[in-house]
A protein has these predicted regions:
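Short, solvent-exposed alpha-helical surface patches in well-structured domains
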Residues: 24, 56, 92-93, 152, ...
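Basic, Lys/Arg- and aromatic-enriched nucleic-acid-binding interface segment
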Residues: 2-51, 55, 77, 136
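Active-site/catalytic core of tyrosine-dependent DNA strand-transfer enzymes
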Residues: 75, 87-127, 139
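Residues in the recognition helix of alpha-helical DNA-binding motifs
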Residues: 57, 97, 113, 117, ...
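Catalytic-site neighborhood detector that most strongly recognizes the C-terminal catalytic loop/helix
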Residues: 16, 75-76, 150, 157-182
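Basic, Lys/Arg-rich DNA-contacting stretches centered on the C-terminal catalytic core
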Residues: 7-11, 25-33, 51-52, 65-91, ...
Length: 184
C-alpha cells in the first residue's frame, strides 16, 4: 500500500486588534444606543469569551465582587464549564452597567446590533473586513504577553491543551501595546 504524504501546514499570521482599533471599537460600542452592546464587547475583548457564549450569558453569571464570569457547560463550545476572570479593564466597563440577574448580557437582536457597532467603528465588508474571533485572539495575545503563562491562558480560554493556543490563537505582542491594552 502506498503511503499518502501529509500536506505541510502553513500557519497564517494571527489577526489581532491594534490599540487604536480597540479604542475606536470600545468608544463606538459605548456611544451606540446608550452603550447597550458595551458589556458584551468588553467580555469578548477582555475575557476572551466566544461570541456565541456571550450571546447566551445572563447577568446572574457575572460576579463583579469575585471578579468572575461563569460559563455554563451548555453555553460553551467544548461542553465544559469554566470560570473566566474579570480583569480590571472589564471591571471598569461593567460596574455601572449591570442589569438584573435574569437579563441577558446581549440586547435583543444582538447579531444585528453587533454588526452595526463594527460597521460604525470602521469595519466594512470589502475595505476593512472583520476577522471572525479577532477579539478572542486579541485577548489571548495580550493576555500571554502580560501574564506569560500558557497554562493560565488555557484555563481562561477553555482549551484542553495549549497546542491550539500556540499555533492558532496567539500573536506576538510587544510591551507598550500590552501595557495600553491592560491600562484602560
Amino acid at each position: 500500500m502506498a503511503q499518502v504524504e501529509r500536506p505541510q501546514v502553513v500557519e497564517k499570521p494571527i489577526a489581532i486588534l491594534e490599540p487604536e482599533e480597540i479604542t475606536t471599537l470600545l468608544r463606538t460600542a459605548a456611544e451606540y444606543e446608550g452603550g447597550k452592546c458595551l458589556p458584551a464587547v468588553g467580555m469578548m475583548l477582555y475575557a476572551g469569551i466566544r461570541p456565541h457564549e456571550v450571546a447566551r450569558l445572563q447577568w446572574a453569571q457575572v460576579n463583579l465582587s469575585e471578579r468572575s464570569i461563569c460559563i455554563h457547560p451548555q453555553h460553551s463550545k467544548t461542553g465544559g464549564a469554566r470560570l473566566v476572570t474579570i480583569h480590571p479593564p472589564l471591571v471598569k466597563l461593567l460596574q455601572d452597567r449591570q442589569q438584573p440577574p435574569e437579563h441577558r448580557i446581549c440586547p435583543p437582536q444582538w447579531p444585528q446590533h453587533w454588526r452595526r457597532v463594527r460597521r460604525r467603528a470602521g469595519w466594512q465588508r470589502r475595505l476593512h473586513p472583520w476577522t471572525p474571533d479577532v477579539l478572542r485572539h486579541t485577548f489571548a495575545s495580550y493576555h500571554l504577553s502580560h501574564f506569560r503563562s500558557y497554562a493560565e491562558l488555557q484555563l481562561e480560554m477553555g482549551h484542553r491543551d495549549s497546542a491550539l493556543l500556540r499555533t492558532r490563537y496567539v500573536s506576538a505582542v510587544q510591551g507598550k501595546k500590552t501595557e495600553r491594552f491592560w491600562k484602560r
